[in-house]
């Protein structure tokens, strides 16, 4: 069998050195867990970014099933200076999928490390391996009738909690800030040591998934969106399943209402009257997630005209902004908070409140209610069919939870997107003080001209938002080095100093978040 994927090699590695490493991978993992042929590597090179697949082609993929095997892979990589790109389930759609950040890196696939090690229904936590999916966890909870619920991103069933948390993804329940709910990591370092964060270093400790901090420096965050180690176990807290769950939607007809919506909502989030991550979705986000397509309304090139969007609102009952939230607790708690919430929106004098009883099984209400109650689904994949063609990049700047800021960001984004003939497909995810302004830059990747426009558009979005003091909190692998520049040279110098200390051979995902010892820092 050839040890070569069409001459795709790791940067700076000779064919001979690569072949030696592959032989050692085979001895360690078995032939079935070492993939080098082009057709075997296709699943690891399905990107949605505006570049050729070849730019992110792996040279090989290896699958580990134990921590000891991960340690062995790291040892081989150090011996032969082989860079590896680690994935858990590889479902990071819109952010790079499973493909490596740099051409030629070897994929370390942890999908076969898929044990649910423990779920404690009394202390409400889980400890899992990286290959565990949200769908797998949900099934386990249901089969064992456990009184806990999950929080996850959307679409959720095939993604996993470890990968999502390591990328600092968010969900839609009261536990929606996933990294905040993480408690205890096991990490294989570049030298092969196995490090446990928090209380995990104490022999016999039963508080590893209970108390986040441990003693001395708290290093969990150092391993997220970074390349300082390989997470092989993660603990996280689970929300006790409430006796009453009341989802609702508030539909607003006017795009200008965003200022009043956010300013009315913020006190409800700060006081925890509404405890979950609230969503305010644009019309086109609603349309895509309801599995409508642009072609049903217009075949004209360019962005979708406002007149067409207005017609869509009229036809479907969707708003210019569509707010989704939920109440949780005892019946008494929910009743009290429901009166507070409805009084706020009645005082606002705009917005039509829709309850679950009124919405029934209609989409997108149904899948939103599922997301807010910990039921995984794949409904939001419909966004990718809005325009079609397989192109998607998430542009995710952070804003204050202040109406004027949201209005400003929405206007900026629309202006740039429309300049390049693309649609504003967006949602705000509302925390007590901040908002994630998540925009899906959708384009036809089979159209070279449109792909070129999408690339220019994303660059301009980064530039224009940075001029106003905004930066994204997460980005696809094509733009990670560019976004790292937004945060200034001191941060980058420190990140590279840490990299030199913990990974002097630069084997762990060089280029992740712009951290690469080949950079001049």
UniProtKB/Swiss-Prot annotation:
| Known EC number | 1.17.9.1
Q: Where is the FAD-binding PCMH-type domain?
A: 54-268
Q: Name one Pfam family in it.
A: FAD-oxidase_C
Q: Which UniProt keywords apply?
A: FAD, Flavoprotein, Oxidoreductase, Plasmid
User: SUPFAM superfamilies this protein is in?
Assistant: FAD-binding/transporter-associated domain-like, FAD-linked oxidases, C-terminal domain
How is the cofactor bound, as the UniProt entry phrases it?
A: Binds 1 FAD covalently per subunit.
Record pathway? Aromatic compound metabolism; p-cresol degradation
In the record, which positions carry O-8alpha-FAD tyrosine? 384
> Record keywords: Nucleus included?
no
Which GO terms are recorded in the biological process aspect for this UniProt protein? lactate catabolic process
An example of a GO molecular function for this protein is: 4-cresol dehydrogenase (hydroxylating) activity
Q: Which cofactor does it need?
A: FAD
Domain of life of the native organism: Bacteria
Catalytic activity line of the entry: 4-methylphenol + 4 oxidized [azurin] + H2O = 4 reduced [azurin] + 4-hydroxybenzaldehyde + 4 H(+)
Q: What class of enzyme is it?
A: oxidoreductase
Protein purpose? Catalyzes the azurin dependent hydroxylation of the methyl group of 4-methylphenol to form 4-hydroxybenzaldehyde.
Q: Subunit arrangement?
A: Tetramer of two cytochrome subunits and two flavoprotein subunits.
* Name of this chain's protein: 4-cresol dehydrogenase [hydroxylating] flavoprotein subunit
Query: Native species of this protein?
Result: Pseudomonas putida
């Amino acid at each position: 069998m050839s040890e070569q994927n069409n001459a795709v090699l790791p940067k700076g590695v000779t064919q001979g050195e690569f072949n030696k490493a592959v032989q050692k991978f085979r001895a360690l993992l078995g032939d079935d867990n070492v993939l080098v042929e082009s057709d075997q590597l296709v699943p690891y090179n399905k990107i949605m970014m505006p570049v050729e697949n070849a730019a992110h082609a792996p040279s090989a993929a290896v699958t580990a099933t134990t921590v000891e095997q991960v340690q062995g892979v790291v040892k081989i990589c150090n011996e032969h200076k082989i860079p590896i790109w680690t994935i858990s389930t590889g479902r990071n759609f819109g952010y790079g999928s499973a493909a490596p950040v740099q051409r030629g890196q070897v994929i370390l696939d942890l999908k076969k490390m898929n044990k649910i090690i423990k779920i404690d229904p009394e202390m409400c936590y889980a400890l899992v391996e990286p290959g565990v999916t949200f769908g797998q966890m949900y099934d386990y909870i249901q089969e064992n009738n456990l009184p806990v619920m999950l929080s996850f991103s959307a679409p959720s069933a095939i993604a996993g909690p470890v990968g999502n948390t390591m990328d600092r993804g968010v969900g839609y329940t009261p536990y929606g800030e996933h990294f905040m709910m993480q408690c205890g990591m096991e990490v294989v370092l570049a030298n092969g040591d196995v490090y446990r964060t928090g209380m995990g270093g104490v022999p016999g400790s039963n508080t590893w998934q209970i108390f986040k901090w441990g003693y001395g420096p708290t290093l969990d965050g150092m391993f997220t969106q970074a390349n300082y180690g390989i997470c092989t176990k993660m603990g996280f807290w689970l929300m006790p399943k409430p006796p009453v769950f009341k989802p609702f939607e508030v539909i607003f007809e006017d795009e200008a209402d965003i200022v009043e919506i956010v300013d009315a909502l913020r006190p409800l989030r700060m006081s925890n009257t509404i405890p979950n991550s609230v969503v305010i979705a644009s019309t086109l986000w609603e349309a895509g997630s309801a599995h409508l397509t642009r072609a049903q309304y217009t075949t004209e090139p360019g962005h979708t005209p406002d007149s067409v969007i207005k017609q869509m609102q009229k036809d479907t009952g969707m708003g210019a902004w569509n707010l989704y939230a939920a109440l949780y607790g005892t019946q008494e708690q929910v009743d009290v908070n429901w009166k507070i919430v409805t009084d706020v929106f009645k005082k606002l004098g705009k917005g039509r409140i829709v309850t679950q009883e009124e919405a029934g099984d209609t989409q997108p209400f149904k899948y939103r209610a599922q997301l807010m109650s910990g039921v995984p689904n794949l409904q939001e994949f419909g966004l990718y069919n809005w325009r079609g063609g397989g192109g998607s990049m998430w542009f995710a700047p952070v804003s204050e939870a202040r109406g004027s800021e949201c209005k400003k960001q929405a206007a900026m984004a629309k202006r740039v997107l429309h300049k390049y003939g693309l649609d504003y497909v967006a949602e705000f995810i509302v925390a007590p003080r901040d908002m994630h302004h998540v925009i899906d830059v959708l384009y036809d990747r089979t159209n070279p001209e449109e792909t070129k426009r999408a690339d220019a558009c994303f660059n301009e979005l980064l530039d224009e938002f940075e001029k106003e003091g905004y930066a994204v909190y997460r980005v696809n692998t094509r733009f990670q080095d560019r976004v790292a520049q937004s945060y200034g040279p001191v941060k980058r110098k420190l990140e590279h100093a840490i990299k030199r200390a913990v990974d002097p051979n630069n084997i762990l995902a060089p280029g992740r978040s712009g951290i690469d010892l080949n950079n001049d820092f």
